[in-house]
Amino acid sequence: MSGPHPTGLHRLAETIAARKGADPETSWTAKLLAKGPEKCAEKFGEEAVEAIIEAVKGDRAKLISEAADTLYHLLVMLAARDVTLSDVENELDRREGRSGIEEKASRK
């Protein structure tokens, strides 16, 4: 969590985590998670492609909507593999201050 006032992404991640054990009949998130990590990854990919299409088209409102869907599905996919938003933030913190070229070279 991010301090005393969690961001919207942290609140969403907390909601997704709470729905992991919920009834798939009453929660879309629980239903998606019950289908397994592969289905969650597939949905993330679909939403990412839709965001890319809207970015190319230049429709700002649709891009914002698709970006929100993409972030939701990214968090669901991460939750399906027990990866938290904090885990990802820690990785970003680790990379902070390094050039992208230097960081990418260190992964080879």
Swiss-Prot record:
One term of GO molecular function: ATP binding
Pfam families: PRA-PH
Record-level GO cellular component terms: cytoplasm
Gene3D superfamilies xrefs: MazG-like (1.10.287.1080)
Cell compartments where the protein resides: Cytoplasm
Keywords, comma-separated and alphabetical: Amino-acid biosynthesis, ATP-binding, Cytoplasm, Histidine biosynthesis, Hydrolase, Nucleotide-binding
Pathway: Amino-acid biosynthesis; L-histidine biosynthesis; L-histidine from 5-phospho-alpha-D-ribose 1-diphosphate: step 2/9
Region (Disordered): 88-108
Highest taxon, organism lineage: Bacteria
Enzyme Commission no: 3.6.1.31
Catalyzed reactions: 1-(5-phospho-beta-D-ribosyl)-ATP + H2O = 1-(5-phospho-beta-D-ribosyl)-5'-AMP + diphosphate + H(+)
UniProt xrefs under SUPFAM superfamilies: all-alpha NTP pyrophosphatases (SSF101386)
One BP term from GO: L-histidine biosynthetic process
Signal peptide interval: none
Compositional bias ranges of the Basic and acidic residues kind: 91-108
Family: Belongs to the PRA-PH family.
Protein's name according to its UniProt entry: Phosphoribosyl-ATP pyrophosphatase
Organism: Paracoccus denitrificans (strain Pd 1222)
Gene: hisE
